[in-house]
């Protein structure tokens, strides 16, 4: 191997990724005086959080009665009873505080007449433990909420003297004596290698939507954290649960926020019928996302799709006043014009369910500490490593995430990780020294990939993986499609060793970067389809046609997947059923969140 010189950096904390969770963690660490570095492969305000449109859920009660227990109930039901009770309680209870903090940091929320934060209805958010009408819980900054939060957190992080390493690509974690002690990075603009030694590494690397052919995710969403964790011999959790957003623009997959339905938009089929009324009589178009995506898919299957190929649906906003569209949904009007050539005030938007969110990820507790579960201790913490945001799996979303629960997940758990790091980091201790053996191992892999001279191009292999995942691990799954998908994916993953990289340079080498990203996507994709094939029930986003019912007796448990090459080993760990606070201390009545049939 060519000898790579590298520069070393010493920090208390290194955060990998600068989206909502990464920046909230970075800001929280820096505020406490911890020496904090944030390493990111794209400029912070280009992170994918910028594309989050609809809003951030918190029971502020600005538009009518609401409380954290109702929010928690909706999150439990949304998760199809796979979320961890302690994490879901923490999310719902801390949400208002986290949103008010954002307001004080300077997020320009939309306002009501009285000057309070404006909140809109969103799918699956209800009152009275699912018995009452829909609630307006989703705090919005027009339809550009993620954009507003990201810019604000980046500015605040700079103010607190966090140091940013921008356009640095994380290659691998450094593991020393069973703890994470740093991360190895490649600086894209000058080709240098950098080793960050730290007392704590926080992975905030986002999801792996790009494992699929059509996704609302940016092309940067390649599951880099999951890939690094898998290579370090740690498991990924609940990977079979992939959310399809009901309304991606037909053809491009560009997201149309659920806020469009929250503001009164509705779906129709080829007969002009508001078909959701048949499937979800109470909440109609605002049922949870997995439900709406399945209903659209059923309508298309039964021949009621629109368009020449009868292969998509319509989202109607024409009946809404143009001034409210301009005020509440300006970005959507623009996206529909650019990506579908549609004027939303005059014609419906063509939409189709599109991969949007990964409920699974790196297993953590509700403080964001990464777990290395064993048979004896399913909650064993892996020292020195945290994961937050879509990269992590706390699991607060279980088998299906509610809309607008992701932005609140980012700030609540980014903040929690900072609080916890402040407690566990010994400020007096030495920063770990460079583990040369681990750095060499990471650079050896980097060099092998850089000089790969096989017969398959990265773009071709990526496309083969994406098409297989889209076809065989989709909205509806069967034993047959999943078994075929597993076989196909094992073969595809096996071809990683036969990749060809044509550009050997180290500076702005997009061919090399995309190849490294593919080596991160592949373990995520493989774990997804293997875990899905094994789960013989339907729960949340995992809709199995051969097992249409949820089976709590056998399957209310988290899957764990260890990936090595094209081989996946599965195990399971129990769901946390205990809340943080007992009912007599003001906690939720556990009878309210006992498993029951999920009807909207």
UniProtKB/Swiss-Prot annotation:
Topology versus the membrane: Peripheral membrane protein
Annotated pathway: Carbohydrate metabolism; tricarboxylic acid cycle; fumarate from succinate (bacterial route): step 1/1
First-level EC class: oxidoreductase
Organism domain of life: Bacteria
A GO term for molecular function: succinate dehydrogenase (quinone) activity
Disulfide bonds: none
Gene3D superfamilies (UniProt xref): FAD/NAD(P)-binding domain, Fumarate reductase/succinate dehydrogenase flavoprotein-like, C-terminal domain, succinate dehydrogenase protein domain, Succinate dehydrogenase/fumarate reductase flavoprotein, catalytic domain
Catalytic activity, EC: 1.3.5.1
Catalyzed reactions per annotation: a quinone + succinate = fumarate + a quinol
One Gene Ontology cellular component: plasma membrane
Keywords assigned by UniProt, alphabetized: Cell inner membrane, Cell membrane, Electron transport, FAD, Flavoprotein, Membrane, Oxidoreductase, Transport, Tricarboxylic acid cycle
Binding site for FAD: 17-22, 40-55, 224, 390, 406-407
Binding sites annotated in the UniProt record for substrate: 245, 257, 356, 401
Subcellular location: Cell inner membrane
GO biological process: anaerobic respiration; electron transport chain; tricarboxylic acid cycle
A Pfam family the protein falls into: Succ_DH_flav_C
PROSITE patterns in alphabetical order: FRD_SDH_FAD_BINDING
Oligomeric form and interacting partners: Part of an enzyme complex containing four subunits: a flavoprotein, an iron-sulfur, cytochrome b-556, and a hydrophobic anchor protein.
PANTHER family: SUCCINATE DEHYDROGENASE 2 FLAVOPROTEIN SUBUNIT, SUCCINATE DEHYDROGENASE [UBIQUINONE] FLAVOPROTEIN SUBUNIT, MITOCHONDRIAL
Similarity annotation: Belongs to the FAD-dependent oxidoreductase 2 family. FRD/SDH subfamily.
NCBIfam families on file: sdhA_forward (TIGR01816), sdhA_frdA_Gneg (TIGR01812)
Name of protein: Succinate dehydrogenase flavoprotein subunit
Organism: Paracoccus denitrificans
Lineage start: Bacteria, Pseudomonadati, Pseudomonadota, Alphaproteobacteria, Rhodobacterales
């Amino acid at each position: 191997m060519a000898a790579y010189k590298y520069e070393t950096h010493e920090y208390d904390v290194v955060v990998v990724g600068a989206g909502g969770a990464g920046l909230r963690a970075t800001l929280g660490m820096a505020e406490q005086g911890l020496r904090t570095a944030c390493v990111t492969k794209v400029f912070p305000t280009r992170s994918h959080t910028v594309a989050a449109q609809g809003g951030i859920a918190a029971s502020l009660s600005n538009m009518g009665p609401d409380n954290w227990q109702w929010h928690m109930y909706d999150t439990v039901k949304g998760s199809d009873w796979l979320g961890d009770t302690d994490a879901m309680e923490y999310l719902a209870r801390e949400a208002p505080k986290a949103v008010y903090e954002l307001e004080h940091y300077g997020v320009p929320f939309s306002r009501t007449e009285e000057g309070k934060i404006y909140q809109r209805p969103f799918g699956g958010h209800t009152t009275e433990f699912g018995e009452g009408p829909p609630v307006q819980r989703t705090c919005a900054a027009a339809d550009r909420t993620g954009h507003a939060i990201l810019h604000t957190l980046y500015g605040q992080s700079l103010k607190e003297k966090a140091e940013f390493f921008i356009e640095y690509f994380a290659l691998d974690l450094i593991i020393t004596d069973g703890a994470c002690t740093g991360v190895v990075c490649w600086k894209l603009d000058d080709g240098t290698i950098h080793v960050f030694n730290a007392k704590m590494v926080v992975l905030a690397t986002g999801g792996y939507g790009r494992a699929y052919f059509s996704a609302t995710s940016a092309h940067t969403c390649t599951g880099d954290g999951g890939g690094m964790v898998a290579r370090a011999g740690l498991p990924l959790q609940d990977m079979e649960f992939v959310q399809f957003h009901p309304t991606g623009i037909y053809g491009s997959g560009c997201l149309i926020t659920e806020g469009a339905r929250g503001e009164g938009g509705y779906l129709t089929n080829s007969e002009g019928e508001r078909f959701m009324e048949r499937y979800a009589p109470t909440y109609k178009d605002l049922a949870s996302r997995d439900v709406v995506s399945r209903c659209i898919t059923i309508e298309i299957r039964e021949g009621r799709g629109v368009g020449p190929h009868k292969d998509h649906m319509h989202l109607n906003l024409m009946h809404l006043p143009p001034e409210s569209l301009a005020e509440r949904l300006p970005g959507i009007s623009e996206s529909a014009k650019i990506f579908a050539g549609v004027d939303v005030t005059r014609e419906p938007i063509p939409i189709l369910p599109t991969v949007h969110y990964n409920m699974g990820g790196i297993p953590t507790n509700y403080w964001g500490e990464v777990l290395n579960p064993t048979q004896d201790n399913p909650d064993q913490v892996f020292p020195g490593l945290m994961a937050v945001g879509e990269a992590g799996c706390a699991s607060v979303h279980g088998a299906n995430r509610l809309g607008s629960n992701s932005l609140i997940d980012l700030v609540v758990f980014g903040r929690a990780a900072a609080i916890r790091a402040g407690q566990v980091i010994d400020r007096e201790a030495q920063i770990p020294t460079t583990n040369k053996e681990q750095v060499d191992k990471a650079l050896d892999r980097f060099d092998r990939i850089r000089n790969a001279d096989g017969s398959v191009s990265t773009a071709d292999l990526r496309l083969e993986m994406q098409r297989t995942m889209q076809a065989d691990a989709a909205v509806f799954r069967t034993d047959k499609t999943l078994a075929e998908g597993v076989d196909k994916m094992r073969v595809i993953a096996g071809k990683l060793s036969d990749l060809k990289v044509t550009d050997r340079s180290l500076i702005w080498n997009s061919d090399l970067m995309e190849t490294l990203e593919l080596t991160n996507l592949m373990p995520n994709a493989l774990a997804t389809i293997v875990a899905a094939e094994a789960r013989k029930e339907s729960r949340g986003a995992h809709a199995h046609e051969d097992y249409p019912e949820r089976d709590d007796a056998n399957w209310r448990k988290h899957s764990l997947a260890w990936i090595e090459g094209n081989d996946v080993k599965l195990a399971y760990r129990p769901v946390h059923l205990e809340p943080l606070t007992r009912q007599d201390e003001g906690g939720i009545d556990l009878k309210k969140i006992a498993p029951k049939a999920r009807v909207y």
